[in-house]
């Protein structure tokens, strides 16, 4: 059992001293626990510094190993530079006109989640049936989270493989979720997690992430003549024509 009144997370961390932590065949050796059967999801590279054992709300146990001296091969140079605009209708739109779908994993599972939560509310407190209902909800949340993480990892890896420099906007999701009409959609999109993945993977693979100031008027700027039209401050304007050169723009591609 995990016991920590100051931390809601169910986890503990052990430092590696000598060979008290090591990966075996279909098992991992941990201090005080010995060899514990497990499914190895990734090849362990480098020297192990510590192991963190955790349990998620659905009752599954995980071991995360912190390693050093692990070499990551840089990706081949492509010479490509793109800008990425994050959104809700499309998860992201690149400056070369490619729109990446927003799968809205939470929204797709909301009806099922609401049904399970209603069932939970009818169960007697402290009963085994209530624990089972709570576990079902935790497993659904885990499924939604895994879907989202899988998409973010695949998309971030793809963009870094295809481009040397990626420009992204310095968004402030914490401020944006104050809009209650968009809060759930913004949280479901996980823009901050996507940026985090891009930044650490870029460092791994020898690529570069450029963060653009959030007040830079990219949606108002004409890419043809560099003129600025303030009419796009109205978010309902999705397409506009530059009054200077007559070039037509999609606000997401700009």
Predicted stretch roles:
Residues 42-47, 55-254:
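Positively charged, helix-rich recognition surfaces that bind polyanionic ligands
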Residues 1-56:
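Acidic carboxylate diad motif detector
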């Amino acid at each position: 059992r995990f016991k920590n009144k100051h931390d809601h997370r169910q986890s503990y961390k052990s430092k590696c001293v000598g060979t008290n932590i090591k990966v075996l065949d279909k098992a991992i050796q941990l201090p005080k626990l010995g060899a514990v059967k497990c499914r190895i999801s990734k090849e362990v590279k480098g020297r192990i510094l510590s192991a963190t054992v955790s349990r998620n709300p659905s009752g599954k146990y995980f071991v995360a190993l912190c390693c050093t001296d692990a070499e990551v091969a840089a990706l081949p140079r492509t010479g490509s530079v793109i800008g990425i605009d994050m959104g809700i209708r499309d998860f992201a739109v690149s400056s070369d006109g490619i729109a990446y779908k927003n799968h809205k994993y939470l929204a797709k599972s909301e009806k099922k989640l609401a049904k399970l939560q209603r069932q939970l509310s009818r169960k007697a407190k402290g009963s085994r049936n209530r624990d089972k209902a709570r576990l079902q909800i935790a497993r659904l949340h885990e499924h939604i989270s895994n879907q989202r993480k899988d998409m973010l990892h695949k998309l971030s890896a793809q963009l870094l493989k295809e481009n040397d420099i990626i420009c992204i906007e310095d968004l402030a999701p914490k401020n944006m979720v104050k809009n209650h009409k968009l809060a759930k959609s913004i949280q479901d999109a996980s823009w901050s997690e996507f940026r985090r993945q891009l930044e650490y993977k870029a460092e791994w693979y020898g690529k570069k992430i450029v963060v653009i100031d959030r007040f830079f008027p990219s949606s108002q700027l004409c890419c043809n003549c560099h003129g600025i039209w303030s009419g796009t401050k109205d978010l309902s304007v999705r397409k506009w024509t530059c009054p200077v050169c007559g070039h037509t723009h999609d606000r997401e591609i700009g």
